[in-house]
Structures are given as C-alpha cells and as structure tokens.
Amino acid sequence: MASEHSFDISAQVDMMEVKNALETSKKELTARYDFKGVTAQIELSEKDKTITILSSSGNKVDALKDIVISKLIKRNIPPVALSESKRESASGGNIKATLKLNDTLDTENSKKITKAIKDAKLKVTATIRGEEVRVSGKSIDDLQECIRLVKALNLELPINFKNLK
C-alpha cells in the first residue's frame, strides 16, 4: 500500500462530440417553424475553436445559441465550455455571434487549483504540467477528496479528471 496514486486534471472538450451536437442543432434548425424562411447558420471552426452563429435578429441568435447549448449538454459537454466572445452586425442586416470553446487549462486556473489543494492540507502534491495538473498521493481517499474540492471551485472550464492510477 506504499505505492503512489495519481490523477490528472485537465480542461478538454471532445471535438467529435461538439461536431455531433452542431449537426443535431442544424437538423433541429431545419425542422423548427420559427426559423422557416429566415437566415440562420451554425458553423464550427476547429482551427480557432469557435462556433459562429448567424441570424436575422438578436432574438433568433439567442434562440440558436440555446439550441446549441442544449445539444452540447445532451452530449455531456458543460455550458461553461462556451463563452460568447463577440456579437456584431453582418452583411444583409444579419447579426453574427461568435462562441469560443474554452478547452485549455491556463496557468492562472492551474495556480488556483494547486493553491486550493495546498490550502486544504491534504496529504497530496499538485504539480502543473503544461495544460494539466498532476495530483499524486498515497491515499486514494485523499485523491477523491481533491476531486470533490476541485469540483466545488466552480471554475468556468469543463474540468476533466483522468488517469486515476
């Protein structure tokens, strides 16, 4: 029982699930009566990790955003994975909204996580490794307590726990 146990904390979004959610959103868009004869588009840019929503009015853009979020939730992607970066006028009197996928654990949030773990005085060590935080300790119970602690932080990121060994 003297062996070391560990797990990794990261913030990643499964892009295949995002694609599937956007495809089902587009299918719902074609079936909805309130979008008949109205300009409405949903596009994904994998390179920039953004979702672009285009429609004729602000209310329609909000409705499209709600559709996308509901489909992402059904695919187990939390709504905190999206943040609206900008809303602007587009050609033809349309409105364009850009949603950014938050899927990287930056150094600021990594430091928040490691500080919270150290302040909890659990018998574990947390180290920042690029875009993830490695937590290691001798007791699996302490590691599970760390998972509960990080979930309680309510960070605006889709936090994932993986590689529990």
From Swiss-Prot:
Pfam families: DUF520
Top-level lineage group: Bacteria
GO cellular component, one term: cytosol
Single GO term (MF): nucleotide binding
Record keywords, A-Z: Nucleotide-binding
Record function comment: Nucleotide-binding protein.
Family to which the UniProt record says this protein belongs: Belongs to the YajQ family.
Protein name: Nucleotide-binding protein Ccur92_01650
UniProt organism field: Campylobacter curvus (strain 525.92)
Lineage start: Bacteria, Pseudomonadati, Campylobacterota, Epsilonproteobacteria, Campylobacterales
